[in-house]
Amino acid sequence: MTQINPVTHYAVEDGIAIVTTNYPPVNALSVEVIEGLFHAFDRALGDAAVNAIVLICDGRTFIAGADIKNINNAQARPQVDAFELQNRIETSAKPSVAAIHGTALGGGLEVAMTLGYRVAVPSARFGLPEVKLGLLPGGGGTQRLTRLVGAREALDMMTTGQMIDAAQAHRIGLIDEIV
């Protein structure tokens, strides 16, 4: 396993790149996480020995949203922003899988939606809670969620900020498999 940065690790097993984020307590989408994921995906996409990419997170949860302690901190702007990361993942020619446990909220769900396939444990929960903070999903979540689940379900998730469980996420098409 190779350390991309202090919160992102990279390994290749049997042609599958495994990108792991570990930023306790909730794997918030911090500057370090965004940059680490970008560089790990860049590495996997440039490696001819890699046929697919899996994104997993250590700890108790997947990516639980933006790192709100840095939301207004101009000094905490990443060299690579979340849109560049999402575009890099979404336009990849290699298959990619988000392996979700715990919660995938806000920016974390937006990252998960950029991967081609999403699997989750039965206890996983999903949501776009930005409305509860007086915000709108800002990382492409409004468009991607609508494409995945349809306008009615997407609007409900975005306007209520309520979380849904893995069974409902699977039923509406947000995730592809419960494992």
Give each language-model segment a name.
Residues E35, A49, I56-R88, A104, ...:
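Glycine- (often His-adjacent) and acidic-residue-rich active-site loop
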Residues G59-R60, I89-L133, P137-G138, Q162:
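Glycine-rich beta-to-alpha active-site loop
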Residues M1-D58, N72-N73, N87:
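Conserved CoA-thioester-binding segment of acyl-CoA-metabolizing enzymes
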Residues T142-R152:
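Hydrophobic, secondary-structure "cap" segments at the distal end of domains
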Residues M1-T20, E110, T114, T159-V179:
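Amphipathic alpha-helical segments at domain termini/boundaries
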Residues V19, G36-L37, L55, D67, ...:
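Terminal peptide-recognition signature
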